[in-house]
Structures are given as structure tokens and as C-alpha cells.
UniProtKB/Swiss-Prot annotation:
Domain II: annotated span: 72-109
Species whose genome carries this gene: Bacillus licheniformis (strain ATCC 14580 / DSM 13 / JCM 2505 / CCUG 7422 / NBRC 12200 / NCIMB 9375 / NCTC 10341 / NRRL NRS-1264 / Gibson 46)
Annotated gene: dnaA
Protein family (similarity comment): Belongs to the DnaA family.
Assembly, per entry: Oligomerizes as a right-handed, spiral filament on DNA at oriC.
Keyword Cytoplasm: yes
Protein name: Chromosomal replication initiator protein DnaA
Location of region: Domain III, AAA+ region: 110-326
Stretch list, region Domain I, interacts with DnaA modulators: 1-72
Entry GO terms, CC: cytoplasm; plasma membrane
Start and end residues of each stretch annotated as Domain IV, binds dsDNA: 327-446
Highest taxon in the source lineage: Bacteria
Biological processes, Gene Ontology terms: DNA replication initiation; regulation of DNA replication
Compartment(s): Cytoplasm
Length: 446
């Protein structure tokens, strides 16, 4: 066994690649390797809150990473520095030590207890995927087989897969449900060939009732693994066993994926998950806060939801970062504290939201007219022309609809907005002075 500090630094390097930046910096960066007690690797966490979070969320990820680096499955125990006594070092859930040369027993389903249908927040971007997943869970291999869920990182694909597994086991405790990533499938397949255990490997994954395989896109370019998965897929499908697959893209967009696999992925139902809208993001934060027993002011949840619009993982990570920051500096949570806690993870280059009123204000300054003139009925050129420029910019620089733009200009009809946009666009093609004016206005707005 290598020096544990070096081992842990290597592990952190691998884990950093698998987590979002906010999650890694909030939970992993401050951990340190303490010691190795028998088969248990002792890791220090900065406080009780962090320790509990690491145990509930990242135990398996860390154990898998250590296994990949050492070939040994060690128990992982988190402790707080000031409480390090002999009793603290006793592992809560020891993991059987196993060398890579020894055959594994039937794999555990590895389902996260927090990923259930009850904890999944339904929104416009995931409603269909949720309904399809529930249908599959209620009637495995009878509704959609395979079910293929795709979408960006951290949008809830893995959550739905775990939820399917939990539902099946809850309603049929004897069911053999296995969840794993395609990367793990690949690694185990390679090890089985090296150790001459291919038959054991095949029996392990072809004798299940439900196979949940995550991030299938990592099979791209791995010809032998694709061959093995092809036969695994066929065996399960022919025996009416449920297959659920996730990916960051639809089958047709996975490069170097064999056509025969691609076609099989398309046999069942393909559904996507898109980033959550503002209302869904707020609902996710509320549910997360309730699940963790956190009292978070509405203004803070609104602030986080407005700032983090990429995915659920970063959204929840931001919430926990705010809570952890509040705990560390011993201050109440409010919007100002949230802004301070998240300043390092919210891009400073986040595009400014430009409003129609912003445009009217800057155009008014440029042409020396009052804000009320934009809504007035005046038709003099000194007012009408700047108004048309403002309408043009509102169409170009905001997401507002034509009726909405018209409403902000004194309730004018949408055809008036179209006319203004067309007129200014035509003038810009050969009017250098106007081009310069528009450029200056845009620079001030940005």
C-alpha cells in the first residue's frame, strides 16, 4: 500500500473529474487522509455536517476510486479531527476486502436510498421521462424495453434509474436489480478477460431481472466491450428482462457506436431530460431543504435558482455550499450571505439580463428624449426615430415577444414593432452613422 496521503491525493484527483466544481470544492477539497486502520481508510472531514454529507452521498464513489487505484476494497470512515478516538475509527459498514484476482459475488444493486420517485421533482423538462420511468418500474419489460433516457450532466437521469430500481425491489423483494455505469461494466469485463473469469462475468449480468446501466456513451470506441454488451442486451431482452440505459445524448449521436447496438437502443422508448425552468429549480431547492431539515429563506432559494440554471447537481451543491458557509462563519442565511458563499462558482461573465426599460433609458440618453416619450403618441421624427431604434434593439437584445415589446411602447400593435425592426435593419445596411450609434448603445447596455 502506497503512502496514504499520496493515495488520497491521487483519489481526489480522480474524484475531481467526476464531480461538479461546486460539489468537489465544498465537500472533497477540505478532506485529508488520516490513517489506515486494518481494512479501513480514515478520512477527516471539517465538521459534522460535512461528515454526514460525505457518508450519505460519496461513500461508494470514494470506495470505487480507492479500489481502482489499489485493487483493494477498503471501508471508508469519516471522522472529525477533534473527535478522533478509538471508537470513532470503527467502520459503520465494513466492505469485504477483495483483490482483483478474486471473483466477486453477485453485485449489490448500489442504489442510492435518496433517489426515489418520491424525492424526484417533476417539471416541464422531465415530465415525460418521469412518466416513462414510472411505467417501466410498475411493469418491468412490459411497458418500454429498453428505456433510453438522455440529457445533460446533473439533470436527473441517474435519479430516475435508481428510482426504478427502488420501486421494483419494494414491490418484488426477490427481484435481482443491478445498477452500474458503463465504465464499471467495461472495467469488470477487462478484468474478467485478464483473470480468465469471462463466464462468471457473463453470468453476473445476464441473470438479472432489471439492468440499469448509466452513461452508455462511454462504450463508444470500445469494440470488445460493445460486443459483450450486445450479447448481454440480447440475452436479457429475449428473456423478457428490463433494460434501462442513460446517456448524455441520443443513440444516433453517440460516435463509434456499432449500428446493431444503436438499433437495439431504439427498440423501446427514447426520452430526454432538459434543464429545469425557474419554477422547477425553486421547487427542487425547497424539496432539498425539506429533506435535509434546513430552514432556508425564500429570497435565498430565489437567488440561487436565478444564479444556477445549468443542472440539478450544481443547484443542490450551491444550496449546500451556502448552508456550509453559514455554519462555518456562524451567520444567519440571507441573500447577501448566499452571494458571498457562491461568488467563486457563479461565473463573473454570466450574461447580463437586458430589459426593455434598460434599452429605453440608454436610447433616451443618446437622443435626449424622456422615458415617457417612448410610450407617448408623439409622431415627430425626433421621438419616432429613437422609438423605432429602441423597438429594434428590444427585438435583438431581449427574449420578449412582439406583443410584449409593443405593450412596453405605449400598447402599440406587434406589426408596429415588426415595421420598426425592418426599417432600422434596412438603414443599418448602409448608414455608417447609425451603425456607430447602435454600437455605442449596445456597449452601454452590456
Amino acid at each position: 500500500m502506497k503512502n496514504i496521503s499520496d493515495l488520497w491525493n491521487q483519489a481526489l484527483g480522480q474524484i475531481e473529474k467526476k464531480l461538479s466544481k461546486p460539489s468537489f470544492e465544498t465537500w472533497m477539497k477540505s478532506t485529508k487522509a488520516h490513517s489506515l486502520q486494518g481494512d479501513t481508510l480514515i478520512i477527516t472531514a471539517p465538521n459534522e455536517f460535512a461528515r454526514d454529507w460525505l457518508e450519505s452521498r460519496y461513500l461508494h464513489l470514494i470506495a470505487d476510486t480507492i479500489y481502482d487505484l489499489t485493487g483493494e476494497e477498503l471501508s471508508i470512515k469519516f471522522v472529525i479531527p477533534q473527535n478522533q478516538n478509538e471508537e470513532d475509527f470503527m467502520p459503520k459498514s465494513p466492505i469485504k476486502k477483495m483483490s482483483k484476482e478474486e471473483p466477486a459475488d453477485f453485485p449489490q444493486n448500489m442504489l442510492n436510498p435518496k433517489y426515489t420517485f418520491d424525492t424526484f421533482v417533476i417539471g416541464s423538462g422531465n415530465r415525460f421521462a418521469h412518466a416513462a420511468s414510472l411505467a417501466v418500474a410498475e411493469a418491468p419489460a412490459k411497458a418500454y424495453n429498453p428505456l433510453f433516457i438522455y440529457g445533460g450532466v446533473g439533470l436527473g437521469k441517474t435519479h430516475l434509474m435508481h428510482a426504478i430500481g427502488h420501486y421494483v425491489i419494494d414491490h418484488n423483494p426477490s427481484a435481482k436489480v443491478v445498477y452500474l455505469s458503463s465504465e464499471k461494466f467495461t472495467n469488470e469485463f477487462i478484468n474478467s478477460i485478464r483473470d480468465n473469469k469471462a463466464v462468471d462475468f457473463r453470468n453476473r449480468y445476464r441473470n438479472v431481472d432489471v439492468l440499469l446501466i448509466d452513461d452508455i456513451q462511454f462504450l463508444a470506441g470500445k469494440e470488445q466491450t460493445q460486443e459483450e454488451f450486445f450479447h448481454t442486451f440480447n440475452t436479457l431482452h429475449e428473456e423478457t428482462k428490463q433494460i434501462v440505459i442513460s446517456s448524455d445524448r441520443p443513440p444516433k449521436e453517440i460516435p463509434t457506436l456499432e449500428d446493431r447496438l444503436r438499433s437495439r437502443f431504439e427498440w423501446g422508448l427514447i426520452t430526454d431530460i432538459t434543464p429545469p425552468d425557474l419554477e422547477t429549480r425553486i421547487a427542487i431547492l425547497r424539496k432539498k431543504a425539506k429533506a435535509e431539515g434546513l430552514d432556508i429563506p425564500n429570497e435565498v432559494m430565489l437567488y440561487i435558482a436565478n444564479q444556477i440554471d445549468s443542472n440539478i447537481r450544481e443547484l443542490e451543491g450551491a444550496l449546500i455550499r451556502v448552508v456550509a458557509y453559514s455554519s462555518l462563519i456562524n451567520k444567519d442565511i440571507n441573500a447577501d450571505l448566499a452571494a458571498e458563499a457562491l461568488k467563486d462558482i457563479i461565473p463573473s461573465s454570466k450574461p447580463k439580463v437586458i430589459t426593455i426599460k434598460d434599452i429605453q433609458r440608454i436610447v433616451g440618453q443618446q437622443f435626449n428624449i424622456k422615458l415617457e416619450d417612448f410610450k407617448a403618441k408623439k409622431r415627430t421624427k425626433s421621438v419616432a426615430f429613437p422609438r423605432q431604434i429602441a423597438m429594434y434593439l428590444s427585438r435583438e437584445m431581449t427574449d420578449s415577444s412582439l406583443p410584449k415589446i409593443g405593450e412596453e411602447f405605449g400598447g402599440r400593435d406587434h406589426t408596429t414593432v415588426i415595421h420598426a425592426h425592418e426599417k432600422i435593419s434596412k438603414l443599418l445596411s448602409d448608414d455608417e452613422q447609425l451603425q456607430q450609434q447602435i454600437k455605442e448603445i449596445k456597449e452601454q447596455l452590456r
